[in-house]
């Protein structure tokens, strides 16, 4: 009845499985600063906000972890975009924006790609273009042995000695990724998560994606994203059947190294996912990879409304499941009593 607030926690209670996985991290054990109390012999559970971070962590946040940070691929592409605009201005070349369709009061042009259901073909094009800019505008050629295609070839064909000197073009990267996504029947959301894991690997491991390692890095990111995102994940042996010449042992070893370099951080917040989606759309606009626009018809409007209602109902169900109902002491007078039946 006073102003004292108490909280009862069973000393035998164990954290939830999902929370335990979220705070598990490979590396040196975290030394939590705990003030031991004689009256509280229960175990201390580390909260995710209690983690220790580097001194410059908040100065340069990782874009794959924080929605406020700008994506790496978009910043690397700005140099080429500015050069293209400058060249078009000097040569009096139209950038192609005159053919773009704009909405009016009577007609609305929309594409079939949304943040919840992106277009597969357009998304793969944008993701591979982002990988292309990563390779082209890399700072150096830092790499690791596990990703070196010369030491771990994906095919039986001998890798040329000057393989690391020739940057792959966008079409080459697109064909490689499209083959994997088509054979494994992966979704467009998986492609976006693949790019998140790729940039997280480059940041955490402090390496660069270059001609000698890009295929194995992309393959490892796709492998991990397909297992995390899709309900029916593709097995490692399935990728071996797609690529033919790679062994299961090599796939397992690469996956293990990939997870260790990510410090087992495979979480992708919704805000980070949305940021990557819209930055990919910006990348497409800057490089004239426009999405297919069609006039909004009555049928398409009803379809979009149905998709919106489906997502809204889904989020409502999740919020209701997570909601905890409680009754305060102020409403004790208004509690309804069950009606008694007198026979």
From Swiss-Prot:
<keyword id="KW-0195">Cyclin</keyword>
<feature type="domain" description="Cyclin N-terminal">
    <location>
        <begin position="145"/>
        <end position="267"/>
    </location>
</feature>
<dbReference type="Pfam" id="PF00134">
    <property type="entry name" value="Cyclin_N"/>
</dbReference>
<dbReference type="InterPro" id="IPR013763">
    <property type="entry name" value="Cyclin-like_dom"/>
</dbReference>
<dbReference type="InterPro" id="IPR006671">
    <property type="entry name" value="Cyclin_N"/>
</dbReference>
<protein>
    <recommendedName>
        <fullName>Cyclin-Y-like protein 1</fullName>
    </recommendedName>
</protein>
<dbReference type="InterPro" id="IPR012399">
    <property type="entry name" value="Cyclin_Y"/>
</dbReference>
<dbReference type="GO" id="GO:0005886">
    <property type="term" value="C:plasma membrane"/>
</dbReference>
<dbReference type="InterPro" id="IPR036915">
    <property type="entry name" value="Cyclin-like_sf"/>
</dbReference>
<comment type="function">
    <text>Key regulator of Wnt signaling implicated in various biological processes, such as embryonic neurogenesis.</text>
</comment>
<keyword id="KW-0472">Membrane</keyword>
<feature type="compositionally biased region" description="Basic and acidic residues">
    <location>
        <begin position="17"/>
        <end position="28"/>
    </location>
</feature>
<comment type="similarity">
    <text>Belongs to the cyclin family. Cyclin Y subfamily.</text>
</comment>
<feature type="region of interest" description="Disordered">
    <location>
        <begin position="1"/>
        <end position="48"/>
    </location>
</feature>
<dbReference type="GO" id="GO:0019901">
    <property type="term" value="F:protein kinase binding"/>
</dbReference>
<dbReference type="GO" id="GO:0007399">
    <property type="term" value="P:nervous system development"/>
</dbReference>
<keyword id="KW-0524">Neurogenesis</keyword>
<keyword id="KW-1003">Cell membrane</keyword>
């Amino acid at each position: 009845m006073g102003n004292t607030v108490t909280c009862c926690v069973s000393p035998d209670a164990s954290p939830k499985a999902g929370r335990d996985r979220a705070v598990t991290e490979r590396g040196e054990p975290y030394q939590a600063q705990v003030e031991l109390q004689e009256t509280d012999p229960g175990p201390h559970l580390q909260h995710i906000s209690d983690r220790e971070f580097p001194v410059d962590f908040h100065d340069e946040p990782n874009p794959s972890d924080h929605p406020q940070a700008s994506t790496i691929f978009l910043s690397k592409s700005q140099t080429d975009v500015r050069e293209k605009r400058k060249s078009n201005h000097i040569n009096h070349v139209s950038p192609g924006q005159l053919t773009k369709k704009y909405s009016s009061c009577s007609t609305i042009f929309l594409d079939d790609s949304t943040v919840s259901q992106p277009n597969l073909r357009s998304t793969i094009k944008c993701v591979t273009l982002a990988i292309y800019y990563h390779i082209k505008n890399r700072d150096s050629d830092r790499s690791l042995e596990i990703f070196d295609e010369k030491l771990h070839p994906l095919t039986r064909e001998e890798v040329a000695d000057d393989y690391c000197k020739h940057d792959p073009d966008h079409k080459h990267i697109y064909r490689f990724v499209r083959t994997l996504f088509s054979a494994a029947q992966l979704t467009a959301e998986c492609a976006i998560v693949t790019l998140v894991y790729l940039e997280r690997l480059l940041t955490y491991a402090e390496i660069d994606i270059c001609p000698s390692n890009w295929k194995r890095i992309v393959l490892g990111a796709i492998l991990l994203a397909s297992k995390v995102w899709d309900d029916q994940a593709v097995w490692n042996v399935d990728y071996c059947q797609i690529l033919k010449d790679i062994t299961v042992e090599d796939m397992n070893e690469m996956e293990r190294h990939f997870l260790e370099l990510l410090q087992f951080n495979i979480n992708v917040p919704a805000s980070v996912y949305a940021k990557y989606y819209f930055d990919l759309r910006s990348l497409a606009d800057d490089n004239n990879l426009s999405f297919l626009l069609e006039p909004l018809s009555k049928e398409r409007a009803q379809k979009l409304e149905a998709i919106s209602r489906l997502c809204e109902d889904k989020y409502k169900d999740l919020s209701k499941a997570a909601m905890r109902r409680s009754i305060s002491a102020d409403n004790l007078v208004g509690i309804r009593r069950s009606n008694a039946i007198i026979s």
